[in-house]
């Protein structure tokens, strides 16, 4: 990711007059390959890797017509909050939709999230994958959606400031589960920035429409 390793600099003396064929064997490769003549090699330009986000170009979650699993509101403040459903719901894909925040801003944040099984205890998060997140802040830090189950209460998922409500995140639990509720941990800082206020939960056996 730095200097000749990202530009694959080839000294001109290696080339013959006229037409040359240059073959590059690369596992990753750039988005577009190009060749350019330079007077000096690029040796000190760092290309920083941007964190991978969980929303592909053109994707937009469609919840119209989906069965609502639960809706409610959290209470303001730091620390874990537990939500129990009136009736357990079976499914593999867990969608949490944030509708508002306590600080009045458009940002939503989650430090950690647990999904509760039929026995009321957190199910294993080993097989979890983030299928979709409508917004993830990566310019001012690495606040991607996978932070909600990294076992680190100091890290968190955060949406971008300019993104407006509602915000959604979809988790693939790895297999079908009987879900009795969930637990939510806001950010640990004073005032719990981005703490979700009103929310909805959708649970499906098959993935959501994106």
Predicted features by range, described:
Residues 2-4, 12-61:
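An acidic-aromatic loop/edge-strand motif
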Residues 10-11, 122:
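Short, solvent-exposed coil/turn linker segments
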Residues 52, 60-63, 76-127, 135-138, ...:
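Aromatic, loop-rich ligand-recognition surfaces of beta-strand-rich domains
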Residues 1-8, 64-78:
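Solvent-exposed beta-strand/loop surfaces of large extracellular or lumenal domains
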